[in-house]
């Protein structure tokens, strides 16, 4: 969990962004944050959590995170027109910063509804989709957060 100390330290680190390239960004997150407290913990959606996930993906994907996403997900789904901002680390921003056509956004919905399958090919493990779309953490009202997926019930014409 990030603290006020980290937020203060982050402002100092951002004065020289070159020092946060590559894995240095994640090192700063871990070095200047407090240990995770024991249960119960309060849920807090924050950018560093997604940045850590992007760093891990970048470390394990043979061609790096950006090429992996481009080839193994977007490319297989026929998504070619998109823009993805880059973080200070040089990796794609993970919490925000992507632009995609609405018709391609619908493809992500279809991928999730298809339990990770796209045109018969399993692109994302079904078990991950199940966990990601399950109400793992209550956020507010009827909103829940899974693994990078928000879910919330809405009523339309009296139906949920």
Predicted features along the sequence, with ranges:
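Active-site-adjacent helix/loop patches that line small-molecule binding or acyl-intermediate pockets
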Residues: 1-79, 100-106, 110-111, 116
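Surface-exposed patches in mature extracellular/periplasmic domains of secreted proteins
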Residues: 44, 84, 119-121
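Short, flexible turn/loop "capping" segments at secondary-structure junctions
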Residues: 49, 85-88
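Active-site Gly/Thr loop motif
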Residues: 79-81, 130-160
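Carbohydrate-binding/catalytic loop surfaces
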Residues: 87-100, 150-157
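Residues that flank catalytic or metal-binding motifs in active/ligand-binding sites
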Residues: 94, 101-104, 128, 143-145
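Short, conserved, surface-exposed binding loops centered on an aromatic residue
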Residues: 97-101, 121, 139-141
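A conserved catalytic-loop motif detector
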Residues: 110, 118-136
């Amino acid at each position: 969990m990030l603290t006020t100390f980290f937020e203060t330290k982050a402002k100092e680190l951002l004065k020289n962004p070159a020092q946060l390239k590559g894995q240095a960004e994640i090192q700063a997150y871990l070095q200047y944050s407090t240990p995770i407290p024991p249960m119960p913990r309060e849920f807090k959606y924050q950018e560093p959590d997604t940045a850590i996930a992007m760093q891990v993906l970048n470390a394990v994907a043979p061609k790096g995170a950006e090429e992996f996403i481009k080839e193994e997900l977007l490319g297989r789904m026929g998504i070619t027109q998109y823009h993805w901002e880059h973080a200070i680390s040089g990796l794609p921003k993970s919490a925000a910063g992507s632009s995609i056509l609405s018709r391609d956004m619908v493809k992500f919905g279809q991928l999730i509804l298809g339990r990770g399958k796209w045109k018969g090919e399993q692109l994302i493990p079904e078990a991950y989709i199940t966990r990601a779309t399950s109400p793992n953490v209550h956020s507010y009202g009827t909103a829940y957060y899974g693994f990078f997926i928000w879910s919330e019930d809405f009523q339309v014409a009296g139906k949920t």
